[in-house]
């Protein structure tokens, strides 16, 4: 069972009055997120790397873990915001603890459980456990006996790892996402309704797909929103026009084009490694 954020039911942004105030949140988001940003050389020294797992292998396992938690989330009909928060928790966890000692499915399930609390999209533990069983067995119709060993195994895994996850995250529940910022940017720079809708859809898929990578640990939500806009405009052939004459749009929002292109290239790496899981989004390298 393959998971593609590009084809998920949660591709389109939710209509939320709070989006109108996104511009006021951008500075706070950038400042708040800084403590969880890591430099490239730090990914060569993760706990998993110290346990003898090459980062190339760790990246693959991280991607599988996020795919698992996303499938569980779709079974539970969770909004994309909750899934992104769960994925961010997942990636942060493995900057503190080794993937060799803590299986990515176990932590993925726990991240879903905790993210539903943090985002106030609560689901019953029973329903989360049943969804984990079905996704793990690759059987959407699987009948789960609540007294079965499999049911109790997943239930115990989630409850046991919840405290471990909380400690690894330093009880930091404020996890900003790029979605509201992205909507603000598309409204700011793309005035044509048809182009804006197409661009928003593609850029939204970029953010969804980026959850399978470590981009949330490398760049702030503001940079990721800008990268999504840049990549989406390339895919949709939509011109993004700055409001101020003589400046590029990324200069107006004070985001480095070097960072934007680096984020796009990380997504190109993901596409090249698993194109069958990327839906219609074809991420290409930016020189």
Across the structure, where does each feature detected by a protein language model lie?
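C-terminal region detector
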Residues: 3-11, 211-226, 231-287
């Amino acid at each position: 069972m393959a998971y593609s954020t590009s084809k998920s039911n949660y591709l389109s942004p939710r209509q939320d009055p709070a989006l109108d105030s996104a511009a006021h949140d951008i500075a706070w988001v950038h400042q708040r997120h800084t403590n969880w940003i890591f430099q490239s050389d730090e990914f060569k020294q993760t706990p998993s790397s110290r346990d003898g797992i090459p980062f190339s292998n760790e990246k693959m396992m991280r991607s599988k873990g996020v795919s698992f938690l996303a499938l569980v989330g779709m079974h539970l009909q969770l909004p994309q915001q909750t899934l992104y928060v769960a994925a961010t928790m997942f990636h942060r966890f493995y900057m503190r603890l080794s993937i060799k000692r803590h299986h990515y499915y176990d932590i993925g399930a726990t991240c879903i459980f905790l993210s539903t609390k943090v985002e106030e999209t609560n689901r019953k533990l029973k329903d989360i456990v049943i969804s984990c069983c079905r996704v793990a067995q690759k059987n959407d119709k699987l009948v789960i006996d609540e007294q079965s060993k499999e049911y109790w195994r997943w239930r115990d895994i989630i409850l046991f790892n919840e405290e471990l996850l909380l400690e690894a995250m330093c009880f930091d529940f404020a996890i900003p996402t790029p979605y509201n910022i992205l909507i603000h940017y598309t409204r700011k720079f793309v005035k044509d309704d048809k182009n804006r809708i197409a661009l928003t859809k593609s850029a939204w898929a970029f953010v969804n797909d980026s959850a399978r990578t470590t981009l949330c640990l490398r760049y702030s939500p503001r940079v990721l929103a800008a990268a999504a806009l840049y990549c989406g405009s390339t895919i949709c052939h939509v011109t993004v026009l700055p409001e101020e004459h003589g400046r590029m749009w990324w200069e107006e929002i004070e985001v480095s084009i070097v960072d934007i292109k680096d984020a796009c290239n990380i997504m190109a790496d993901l596409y090249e490694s698993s194109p069958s899981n990327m839906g219609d989004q074809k991420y290409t390298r930016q020189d």
